[in-house]
From Swiss-Prot:
Name the UniProt record assigns to this protein: Alpha-(1,6)-fucosyltransferase
Ranges of residues in domain SH3: 502-563
Species lineage: Eukaryota, Metazoa, Chordata, Craniata, Vertebrata
Entry function: Catalyzes the addition of fucose in alpha 1-6 linkage to the first GlcNAc residue, next to the peptide chains in N-glycans.
Species for this entry: Homo sapiens (Human)
Gene: FUT8
Superkingdom of this protein's organism: Eukaryota
Length: 575
């Protein structure tokens, strides 16, 4: 009898018992569905812990397999070490299972409940405070009224920041933060594998292709979004994206001189048949399809924003506050992988500018947008939100300096900002502002500048800008790839987030609303509201699609309608 036979049987017995326990726990999860008062957050936490236990079970199985001793002479030294490691893993696993059993018996964690009650109490106290202060305002006049109103807003800000801070800590308690980090990472890696598979066919001569020309008549942010739109259609129709970028107005050498190629194996647009876009079904037998700009796209496929893949939707809703933005960001992430020289430029600029956290990014667009697509906004409008967020950050971290990364196409703004706000440290490169002017915009130096601005804006802890600007929206999209959920890390002075050429942006009414003025629209729960914009005053504007009426409605009375599309899942990417 070999000396390890007993150990092997013992290991297998424990693994079998552990597997049985996992099955038992799973059964309890199913039975617990009869109790709807369990929050979705707690369910997410339990599922994440179960996933970790399953992974450890698989790790132990592999370790046990490695302990099989071949016939013949046995070297006992390494085997003894492996058994000890296995024993330690089993002890840890047993502790985790016991902790899990305690949590399922005892309900939510202590920290979770303490924070939940604190938020509940904070909301009640805020209501008491509002009632009391507004009653006082009725009896005040002149300077006394102004003074009391200012103090009222100051105290109101403290209340709001207290609740927001507690909500942040609630989102991190009981392992929820760790789960969100892992889930976001797993989803990103999954999508990037699928894109990489699509973009690198084994035989380019036989691959179906979608051709996209980068030279749309607009600036860098707009052109990048044009390529993203092409990429999403290519992904949905299972075609390799061929990006034509020679004689690019920003860099005559093309996209690949700045960013990594979109494919390592297939950059040739040739094929046995070529045609212009006429719809996914009609183009089925055409090998090479040329895509127009989104403004001229007809028929429109379902793959346009703000739709997300059906197979990922449930996971995305759990992990991210704006799944549509996250989905767009995955294509941006793949496209802007820098060439080594650009990577070096970014590193050197980071050191030269002294870019460090905490820092808030501010983007001020002053040239071609103002007067046409956007209104003029003075620096004071931006800095109100900068100061508010620094006060919020100060409740969670040490704010040694209030740093602001200022990106603008107005070279005079940096001096103005430093003069008006001496207590802030403004980080900015005025040479980028000069290169962003209309006369210098389409040069390689200008391209370098806008790429650096977008990089630093995306790296900030919070973003204040106008979403009417493509640069601001690109920075916000990239920000989503750097955090599990950065959907709330912005304030736009004008538009809500949108993607040029997107399909309708709809919301669903969750509370009834009866208009109090002629500007408002009625709503009933379940009504579909086509949102036009948020006025950032508690009201949004949109159309009640059931009634055909357009007007204002309270923003809190609706939720986002998540649009899903049956995208291909590319199972070959997992092989």
């Amino acid at each position: 009898m070999r000396p390890w036979t007993g150990s092997w049987r013992w290991i297998m017995l424990i693994l079998f018992a552990w597997g049985t326990l996992l099955f038992y726990i799973g059964g309890h999860l199913v039975r617990d569905n009869d109790h709807p008062d369990h929050s979705s957050r707690e369910l997410s936490k339990i599922l994440a812990k179960l996933e970790r236990l399953k992974q450890q079970n698989e790790d132990l199985r592999r370790m046990a397999e490695s302990l099989r001793i071949p016939e013949g002479p046995i070297d006992q030294g390494p085997a003894i070490g492996r058994v000890r490691v296995l024993e330690e893993q089993l002890v840890k696993a047993k502790e985790q299972i016991e902790n899990y059993k305690k949590q399922t018996r005892n309900g939510l964690g202590k920290d979770h409940e303490i924070l939940r009650r604190r938020i509940e109490n904070g909301a009640k106290e805020l209501w008491f405070f509002l009632q009391s202060e507004l009653k006082k305002l009725k009896n005040l006049e002149g300077n006394e009224l102004q003074r009391h109103a200012d103090e009222f807003l100051l105290d109101l800000g403290h209340h709001e920041r207290s609740i927001m801070t507690d909500l942040y800590y609630l989102s991190q308690t009981d392992g929820a933060g760790d789960w969100r980090e892992k889930e976001a990472k797993d989803l990103t890696e999954l999508v990037q594998r699928r894109i990489t598979y699509l973009q690198n066919p084994k035989d380019c001569s036989k691959a179906k292709k979608l051709v996209c020309n980068i030279n749309k008549g607009c600036g860098y942010g707009c052109q990048l979004h044009h390529v993203v739109y092409c990429f999403m259609i290519a992904y949905g129709t299972q075609r390799t994206l061929i990006l034509e970028s020679q004689n690019w107005r920003y860099a005559t050498g093309g996209w690949e001189t700045v960013f990594r190629p979109v494919s390592e194996t297939c950059t040739d647009r040739s094929g046995i048949s070529t045609g212009h876009w006429s719809g996914e079904v009609k183009d089925k037998n055409v090998q090479v399809v040329e895509l127009p700009i989104v403004d001229s796209l007809h028929p429109r496929p379902p793959y346009l924003p703000l739709a997300v893949p059906e197979d990922l939707a449930d996971r995305l809703v759990r992990v991210h506050g704006d799944p549509a933005v996250w989905w767009v960001s995955q294509f941006v992430k793949y496209l802007i992988r820098p060439q080594p020289w650009l990577e070096k430029e970014i590193e050197e600029a980071t050191k030269k500018l002294g870019f460090k956290h905490p820092v808030i990014g501010v983007h001020v667009r002053r040239t071609d947008k103002v007067g046409t697509e956007a209104a003029f906004h003075p620096i004071e409008e931006y800095m109100v939100h900068v100061e508010e967020h620094f006060q919020l950050l100060a409740r969670r971290m040490q704010v040694d300096k209030k740093r602001v990364y200022l990106a603008t196409d107005d070279p005079s703004l940096l001096k103005e900002a430093k003069t008006k706000y001496p207590n802030y440290e403004f980080i900015s490169d005025n040479s980028i502002s000069w290169s962003a002017g209309l006369h210098n915009r389409y040069t390689e130096n200008s391209l370098r500048g806008v790429i650096l601005d977008i990089h630093f804006l995306s790296q900030a802890d919070f973003l204040v800008c106008t979403f009417s600007s493509q640069v601001c929206r690109v920075a916000y999209e990239i920000m989503q790839t750097l955090h599990p959920d950065a959907s709330a890390n912005f304030h736009s002075l004008d538009d809500i987030y949108y993607f040029g050429g997107q399909n309708a942006h709809n919301q669903i009414a969750i509370y009834a609303h009866q208009p109090r003025t002629a500007d408002e629209i009625p709503m009933e729960p379940g009504d579909i509201i086509g949102v036009a914009g948020n006025h950032w005053d508690g009201y949004s504007k949109g159309v009640n699609r059931k009634l055909g009426r357009t007007g204002l409605y309270p923003s809190y009375k609706v939720r986002e309608k998540i649009e899903t599309v049956k995208y291909p899942t590319y199972p070959e990417a997992e092989k």
